[in-house]
């Protein structure tokens, strides 16, 4: 039997040239051959200034680790289905993006997922991090999963909570230990007593099942973009919220609000405040507080005491009537 090629004994430049040609999964496998391999590979990969990726991990029944960069898309999914084990797909798109998808068999998918997660975090440079935590899966290991994430990711750009099982404690534990910096997405069931406690302002908060979100919590939400469905906020409370906004008492940084109207028959209660109905033929141009230029057609204007304009639209989304408000400054 021939001896394996002594790859690690190559000069630095030659080794780097070979590693550049290797796919992410090949690099991961190579790092697992020895501790020396991992140390050298970690040093070489992290020295590449341009090799920065976006990481997405999830904890569904078949947990996944995905990362992608300017020319690479890598996706590894763990499965307990032997028929799908060791399945792989690789192709190069016309735009030069290299797609590399792997299905790995495991008797304990979440433990092997956690092992790979640690290896990936050690080897590669990530400039953005996203986490989807499924509250229905691996309930006995949820704290261990979150603790691992905390050890590797003290902060994430995006966090999505998914699930039908009420798991307030898991959500609270995650948010207490891992800082979400941009986007918090609730696609999960929470109890009526759940209290969201945020210490920092976010780019966006989205709530799909807002049974827990009352007027007091709405006032305290800290985000530029707020989407809420399924809340119990009344039209009277919505009117009070808009009046508080007009008086600069809450949400001075908000750019967009979308919220369900619970009683469409009395939606006029919401607009029991100074407002102006803009003809639908009128198109206006303005700039949001995120410095985005927008064009608006029609709508219902309300004014804040500092001159900012909030334009309100009512629209049907499925079987729900939604109030949308976009905040901007009109061009003179």
What does each of the following model-derived ranges do?
Residues 1-332:
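Non-core capping and flanking segments associated with repeat-based/extracellular domains
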């Amino acid at each position: 039997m021939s001896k394996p090629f002594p790859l690690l004994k190559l000069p630095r430049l030659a080794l780097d040239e070979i590693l550049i040609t290797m796919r992410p999964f090949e690099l991961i496998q190579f790092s697992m051959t020895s501790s020396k391999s991992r140390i050298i590979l970690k040093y070489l990969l992290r020295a590449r200034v341009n090799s920065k990726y976006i990481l997405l991990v999830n904890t569904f029944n078949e947990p996944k680790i995905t990362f992608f960069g300017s020319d690479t898309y890598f996706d590894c999914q763990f499965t307990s289905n032997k028929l799908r084990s060791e399945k792989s797909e690789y192709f190069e798109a016309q735009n030069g993006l290299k797609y590399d998808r792997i299905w790995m068999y495991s008797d304990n998918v979440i433990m092997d997922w956690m092992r790979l997660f640690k290896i990936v975090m050690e080897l590669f440079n990530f400039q953005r991090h996203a986490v989807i935590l499924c509250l229905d899966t691996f309930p006995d290991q949820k704290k261990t999963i979150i603790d691992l994430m905390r050890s590797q990711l003290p902060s994430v750009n995006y966090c999505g909570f998914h699930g039908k099982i009420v798991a307030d404690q898991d959500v609270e534990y995650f948010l207490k230990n891992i800082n979400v910096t941009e986007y918090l997405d609730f696609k999960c069931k929470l109890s009526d007593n759940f209290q969201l406690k945020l210490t920092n302002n976010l780019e966006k908060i989205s709530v799909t099942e807002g049974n827990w979100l009352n007027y007091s919590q709405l006032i305290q939400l800290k985000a530029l973009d707020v989407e809420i469905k399924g809340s119990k906020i009344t039209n009277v409370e919505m009117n009070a919220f808009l009046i508080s906004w007009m008086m600069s008492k809450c949400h001075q940084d908000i750019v967009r609000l979308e919220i369900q109207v619970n009683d469409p028959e009395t939606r006029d209660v919401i607009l029991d405040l100074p407002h102006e109905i803009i003809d639908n033929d009128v198109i206006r141009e303005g700039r949001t507080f995120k410095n985005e230029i927008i064009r608006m057609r029609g709508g219902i204007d309300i004014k804040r005491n500092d001159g900012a304009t909030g334009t309100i639209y009512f629209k049907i989304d499925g079987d729900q009537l939604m109030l949308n408000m976009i905040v901007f400054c009109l061009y003179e």
